[in-house]
Amino acid sequence: MKVISRVFVFGLLFLVMLIVSCSEKEGEKVQQSDIKYDQTIIHEKDGSSMKYISGGEFEMGDYLREGNENELPRHQVYLHSFYMDINEVTVGQYREFLEQKYSSDLTDSDGSESIFPQPDWREIQAYSPTDQHPMIYVSWYDAMQYATWAGKRLPTEAEWEYAARGGQIGLRYPWGDYIDMTLANYGGGTGGTSSPDAYAPMLAGPPPSEAPAPKTLKDGDLKQKVVSYGLKNMAANVSEWCLDEWNADFYQECKDSEDIKMGSIRDPFSGGKIVDMMKGFSAVTTPRVLRGGAWNSHHFRVRVSYRNSSLPTFTSNNVGFRCVKDAFP
């Protein structure tokens, strides 16, 4: 009996110690998962305000099945946390970048300008007249150069849509299903009510009596609704470059992947590895993703799920960008 009692006592002590040990480890896990990041930070290099976007899972793609085929199928995506610029990169920020960085590393070995030409400031001023307006006429290469200099990067397409949705499910736009020109700078100052699309009356209300000029707007020009993360102009104003290579079938590939069978695909990115892309982006020749619509876009192109693309050399008066950076413990 004494032997049995001793075995029982020692066994009970071991069980108690095991429970305490596990509890301490669980406590550590909870503590790590409860790490609080600053919701808004000022990025030192370029002075941009950035919002903390808490990672999580969402369904990516066209919920309403009213867009293009490349917006389907919907698929579950899990993203790690990141910071995103509240506003698009401005003319002033880009000018500062050029003043600090423009040197031989932006030219070919023979000294001739190639994929990194100097901006035509007169053209830019016609559509973005002040340093507070979004930078335009920037190629994907230009945006990548800026992001690298600033210690940031372009968002993946999945990060962009996740941020634009702002935690909302199944909406056409970051704020809801209805759009008019008090909510976004789109349609070239005319809105989208004259569209031949069958659902145009449902999507767009009448433009205001005093339509804005057909050009970009700076922060504060439009008393728009912002998405729940506090980001601005995620719909319209300027289309925004993403890091991804364009792949019209990427959503289907994600849906068919082994990862999705486990519940969701983690941090999807079309074009290899992000680290490799950041190091070798000047060798890229394939089309890149554009998101968000622009000041002269029809409201169909302003939808959260709308996908677009262009060659990395492409520049336009309606194309700009914003940056992200990873959030690590």
Predicted regions and their residues:
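Bacterial N-terminal signal peptides that target proteins for export
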Residues: K2-V9
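Bacterial Sec signal peptide processing site at the extreme N-terminus
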Residues: E24-S33
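Surface-exposed recognition segments
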Residues: E66-V77, I169, M234-P329
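Short glycine/proline-rich turn/loop motifs
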Residues: R74, D120-Q132, G191, R303-N308
